[in-house]
A protein has these predicted regions:
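CheY-like receiver
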Residues: 121-153, 261-304
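Acidic catalytic/metal-coordinating carboxylates
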Residues: 34-35, 61-64, 173, 199-202
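Receiver (REC) domain active-site loop signature in two-component systems and cognate sites
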Residues: 57, 195
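C-terminal output helix
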Residues: 107-116, 245-254, 258, 266
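Acidic, metal-coordinating helix/loop segments flanking the phosphotransfer/catalytic sites
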Residues: 32-50, 170-188, 192
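Hydrophobic/aromatic residues positioned on beta-strands within the core alpha/beta folds
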Residues: 81-82, 219-220
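Alpha4 helix (beta4-alpha4-beta5 surface) of REC/receiver domains from two-component response regulators
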Residues: 64, 85-102, 201-202, 223-240
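Two-component/phosphorelay signaling modules centered on CheY-like receiver
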Residues: 2-5, 14-32, 37, 151-169, ...
Length: 304
């Protein structure tokens, strides 16, 4: 990529835009907009690699803007910046906007700089990648691993796999999941946050680092904003869906995940637009490291 990465910052507060432009104008080509509608027009007219939007704006929420920007510029990496812990906004930004990161105000300058550098590196790789011919396995059935004992979830996933000719695998605890993930290629993961009394979040975060192509859909009755934000940033989950299952919404999420999985099959791994954040909490980081180690050791034993 010969020209600098272009970043569009959108916020209704001009002082915020000035601060962001001042911080990043030396590394990137920075453009700013205080009007989300005008921001959408610029995305249609100009090449933009990264968009960073505030959530609470008078004319349109940041989550809605990022969802609409996805339709206009699907390859643009999307980041939500907000001073409020809003579960519904986070869910909308993830499920409809496909956000790369969720950052909070006041932002940490180093965290913001690191996040933008990760996004810019992905954008640069995408821009410089040669066009490659499709390979024969692009339409091969997907492998789906279910980590959920709920009968309704199982019924919906079984119907989806039967309709699409996909392969369904199940695990009933973390140990079974680790064995399956080492034995079998997995494209889609459907998981509750609790399985057999065990917390599945560390596994999801480990897989984001070990298997970037794997798409995770979380289906859970829990409504914890902070937990969701960590899953967005540290596990790069694809969807966050509520229980009890809303069949239409769940089926829509599965279909979108399958379409994304087929798309990513056609790309080299370094062009998959994912870069999971390392867990900030020491205990969680240790658990993730332990699972990554178990994945590696299992793989080594199976190869030997």
């Amino acid at each position: 990529m010969t020209s600098p990465v272009r970043i569009l910052f959108v916020d209704d507060e001009e002082r915020i835009l000035r601060s962001l432009a001042l911080q990043f104008r030396r590394q990137y080509e920075v453009i700013t907009e205080s009007d989300p509608l005008r921001a959408l027009e610029r995305l249609k007219e100009e090449s933009v690699q990264i968009i960073v939007s505030d959530q609470r704006m008078p004319r349109m929420s940041g989550a809605e803007l990022l969802a609409r920007s996805r339709e206009v510029a699907p390859e643009c990496l999307r980041i939500l910046l907000t001073g409020y812990s809003d579960l519904d906004a986070a869910v909308e930004a993830l499920n409809n906007g496909g956000i790369f990161r969720y950052l909070t105000k006041p932002w940490d300058p180093q965290e913001m700089a690191f996040t933008l550098r990760q996004a810019a590196e992905i954008a640069e790789r995408q821009a410089s990648a040669p066009v490659t011919a499709a390979t024969s396995d692009l339409a091969a059935p997907l492998n789906l691993l279910l980590l959920d004992d709920d009968p309704e979830t199982l019924h919906c996933v079984e119907a989806f796999c039967q309709a699409g000719g996909h392969r369904l695998m199940r695990a009933h605890n973390l140990s079974e999941a680790l064995v399956t993930l080492n034995l079998e290629p997995v494209d889609l993961l459907v998981s509750d946050l609790k399985l057999g009394g065990e917390d599945m979040a560390p596994l999801l975060k480990s897989l984001a680092q070990a298997h970037p192509r794997l798409l995770s859909l979380v289906v859970t009755p829990f409504r914890d904003t902070q937990a969701l934000l960590k899953l967005i940033n540290e596990a790069q989950i694809f969807r966050y869906l509520p229980k009890p299952i809303r069949r239409g919404l769940f089926e829509k999420g599965l279909k979108a995940a399958a379409e994304q999985a087929f798309l990513w099959r056609s790309r080299p791994l370094d062009l998959v637009p994912r870069a999971a954040e390392v867990p900030k909490e020491a205990g969680e980081n240790q658990r993730v490291g332990s699972i990554l180690g178990m994945l590696a050791r299992l793989r080594e034993r199976m190869i030997a």
